[in-house]
Amino acid sequence: MMKQRFTSAATSINSKKAPAVYSMKKAVEAMTGRKVVDIGGGRYDTGAEAARAYGATVSVYDPYNRTAEHNEIVLAGAYDVAVISNVLNVIDSEAARANVLKLAGSLAPVVLVTVYEGDGTGTGRQTAADSWQENRRTASYIEEVERALEGFAVVRAGKLIIAERR
């Protein structure tokens, strides 16, 4: 995996509340009863806990907030759906974002992407010593997702991007 200039490890903040993707209607439909890998899912298991309510089993992969041993086990698994929630927006390099997307696409035939839009200006900036924010609207990621996930059909449903292997 490509080294990121900003790890944005400190942006793992949802200790009490599950990320929004775990309650978005179309995302819930895609995850119900399925095995899910959450790429960059952070140090907390709030998403996995929320997904249990609709029969999804979630494994979190996060090179900055989980141990190498944990991540190895997760990467060895087989999944129906990959989630990338509020991860692409904290990576300052398109090449590194593409690596995250390609990893997700290699692990599952369905990839669900959400981003935090920040101030929505589209002007990325450093937000802390080791953190970055792209400040881009969800729609602005579509072409990037399409480029990274060749062979996937990519659509946007509001603040959710859904990529399905053709």
Where do the model's predicted regions map?
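Class I (Rossmann-like) S-adenosyl-L-methionine-dependent methyltransferase catalytic domain
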Residues: M1-L75, V110-R166
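Catalytic P-loop NTPase motifs of RecA-like helicase/translocase cores
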Residues: T67, V90-I91
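A conserved beta-strand element that flanks and buttresses the S-adenosyl-L-methionine
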Residues: V83-N86
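Flexible, active-site-proximal loop/turn residues at the rims of small-molecule/cofactor binding pockets
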Residues: L88, V100, E117
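A short, conserved alpha-helix within the catalytic core of class I
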Residues: I91-L103
